[in-house]
């Protein structure tokens, strides 16, 4: 079942903050329409990442390789602005440093810390003025605003997002596992949907990501012929770069190898919700944050060649893919039209 908020912050200790600029009269090519989103974990969390798109824009992803030394991250940045937007991470680091968060590097001076802030970008530069993109100040403000409750849709990193021919945005979903090896643990996702691919079936208007749960779960019904004619006549998204990015969080006690496997499997949800996914024109990237606050149940005996948390991880992986799929559905349904880019709920109001 879903968590209390059906959001990433159903995982205890995970906070989300946005900062964006959006002019009411923004168009494709003019005005302000971009932003960033920060996922902050006070005390840090085991972190991993899986990059599957052909055109990624990332920061500090190498540090999350399980072969490398650092095991934890303090925050994750999701941002618009393409590669320029990575500057927002400087502001996130500044806020964390001011608040004593990061790897302590000097036992004699606790203020000497190095915050670990991996991040990824979407390409939203054509929406609004090309020269208006997230700066360090955006990241600082988003980190400061991070809280349990947050908005979805056309906010933060989702302001300039487009999903194929329609408006993209930010969405979230969570699952609290009720039984099995991972009973009582929570898995959740937050996704920024900005793919070159389509998020809805041109034959029915139903979202691809509603397939696992069924359209009725989301209150969706097939579109009318008139609605389909309008939606299918929209011009194909013509940008060279695009990208869907996000974060999966869990309270499970995972090591970096298990977290990496969780990130890998989470991409299955992305592939269910977007067609095509992981294209040469997308930089699809999913981070994982594992806080480890949940208690792992006693594991059944397994052959010594297997990790002891194998069955727990298997259940978490299944849930992560579903959360990503649902979060993308939430992003599309929550988005509102800006800059002349129609939203899903505007095209299919039924």
Model-derived segments and spans:
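A structural signal for small-residue-enriched, beta-sheet-centric alpha/beta enzyme cores
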Residues: 1-90, 94, 98-350
């Amino acid at each position: 079942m879903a968590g209390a908020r059906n959001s990433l912050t159903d995982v205890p200790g995970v906070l989300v903050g946005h900062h964006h600029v959006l002019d009411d009269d923004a168009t494709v090519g003019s005005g302000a329409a971009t932003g960033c989103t920060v996922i902050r974990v006070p005390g840090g969390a085991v972190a991993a990442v899986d990059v599957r798109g052909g055109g990624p824009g990332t920061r500090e992803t190498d540090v999350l390789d399980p072969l490398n030394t650092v095991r934890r991250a303090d925050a994750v940045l999701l941002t618009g602005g393409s590669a320029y937007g990575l500057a927002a991470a400087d502001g996130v680091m500044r806020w964390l440093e001011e608040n004593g968060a990061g790897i302590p590097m000097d036992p004699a001076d606790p203020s000497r810390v190095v915050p670990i802030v991996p991040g990824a970008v979407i390409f939203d530069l054509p929406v609004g003025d090309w020269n208006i993109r997230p700066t360090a100040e955006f990241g600082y403000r988003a980190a400061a605003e991070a809280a349990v409750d947050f908005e979805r849709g056309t906010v933060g990193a989702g302001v300039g997002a487009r999903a194929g021919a329609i408006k993209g945005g930010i969405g979230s979903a969570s699952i609290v596992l009720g039984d099995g090896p991972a009973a009582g643990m929570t898995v959740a996702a937050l996704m920024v949907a900005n793919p070159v691919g389509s998020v809805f079936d041109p034959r029915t208007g139903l979202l691809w990501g509603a397939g696992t749960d069924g359209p009725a779960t989301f209150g969706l019904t097939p579109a009318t012929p008139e609605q389909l004619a309008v939606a299918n006549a929209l011009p194909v998204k013509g940008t060279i770069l695009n990208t869907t990015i996000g974060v999966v969080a869990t309270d499970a006690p995972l090591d970096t190898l298990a977290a990496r496997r969780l990130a890998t499997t989470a991409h299955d949800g992305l592939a269910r919700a977007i067609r095509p996914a992981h294209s040469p024109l997308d930089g699809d990237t999913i981070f994982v944050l594992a806080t480890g606050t949940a208690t792992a149940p006693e594991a059944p005996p397994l052959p010594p060649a297997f990790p002891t948390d194998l069955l727990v991880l298997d259940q978490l992986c299944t849930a992560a893919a579903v959360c990503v799929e649902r979060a993308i559905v939430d992003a599309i349904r929550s988005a509102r039209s800006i800059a002349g880019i129609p939203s899903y709920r505007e095209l299919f109001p039924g």
